[in-house]
From Swiss-Prot:
EC numbers on record: 2.7.7.-
Main EC class the enzyme belongs to: transferase
Lineage: superkingdom: Eukaryota
Source organism: Cryptococcus neoformans var. neoformans serotype D (strain B-3501A)
Entries under CDD domains matching the protein: CTU1-like
Presence of the UniProt keyword Cytoplasm in the record: yes
GO molecular function: nucleotidyltransferase activity; tRNA binding; tRNA-uridine 2-sulfurtransferase activity
Name of the protein described by the UniProt record: Cytoplasmic tRNA 2-thiolation protein 1
HAMAP family, sorted: CTU1 (MF_03053)
Species lineage: Eukaryota, Fungi, Dikarya, Basidiomycota, Agaricomycotina
Amino acid sequence: MPPTPCSLCHTARALVKRPKTGQQVCKDCFFEVFETEVHNTIVEGEGIFKRGERVAIGASGGKDSTVLAHVLSVLNKRYDYGLDLYLLSIDEGITGYRDDSLETVKQNQAEYGLPLKILSYSELYGWTMDKIVEQVGKKNNCTFCGVFRRQALDRGAAQLGVDHIVTGHNADDIAETVLMNIMRGDIARLARCTAVTTQSEDTIKRSKPFKYAYEKEIVMYAYFKKLTYFSTECIYSPDAYRGHARVFLKDLEAVRPSAIVDIIHSGESFVLEQSVQRGMKALQTCLRCGYISSNDLCKACALLEGLESGLSRSALRQTQESTSAAPEGHRTIPMFERYASLNGTPRTPPTPAEPVEGIERAA
């Protein structure tokens, strides 16, 4: 039986069957169509980026962030986006997992020639995830990690003076999030979880260029490009709630390959009614650390106070309503500062030529 020709160039032998479309394509055409689809996501509408932006790539060393760093470096040159790219990594303090994956990030730094900033939970919160799990157990540890990681990314970006954070969240991740928000009845998050770009009044802009990129295609891209990435799953994630949504999504995909993007499009159709929006809490800044919050105390400060006090999970919720200073002797989070304040007063970020504390420059 003769080899199947590429359905795009009709000359080379097809090596890849795209999970998203069913197209059988050669390696070079796969690279081109994958990169072009990411570019189309970037430039759709008003576009994700603005020329001259300083952009931090959330780098974990995994397949998604590794491919994102590679593809953004390629597209930035090919289409002349005019971006200053950085790698920003968060060290959660998970022995045997994050310490190994950060070595992969450092290899990526050398390969792509991008400056790297690493910020740890230990230096920011005084806790590592290993210590947190010792205290709270594995059942609820993802709550702590998610809250701490999101704020750590914003704080690392502020230290770099960047305008924008991009993450490697792919189509599978976003479809899982839609399903999770439906199962939890989380209307507010359901209405915004499919957006390519999100930004609150005083948070740094975040974007997901891989919104429509299937996880399987990201893996194939990394494989055929021979990219170095860390493939071990977090040792604390098997019990995460997201895992149930992931299993359900894979079952749907097996029956209907377009299920992933279909769920994303369904999520895009959800819009909050004005009456619901008016009932939501207004955003303000945390009285302790200055980070954006819908309560007087942000989630990170509330969780940290609970850890420092040895509180149970039910008691942790009560700390979010606290307006008092942290108890004496408790560790607290440094004040959050960024380059555009809540009242609109601009603050000048460091220019690319200025050294930024804690940054590792590519050789």
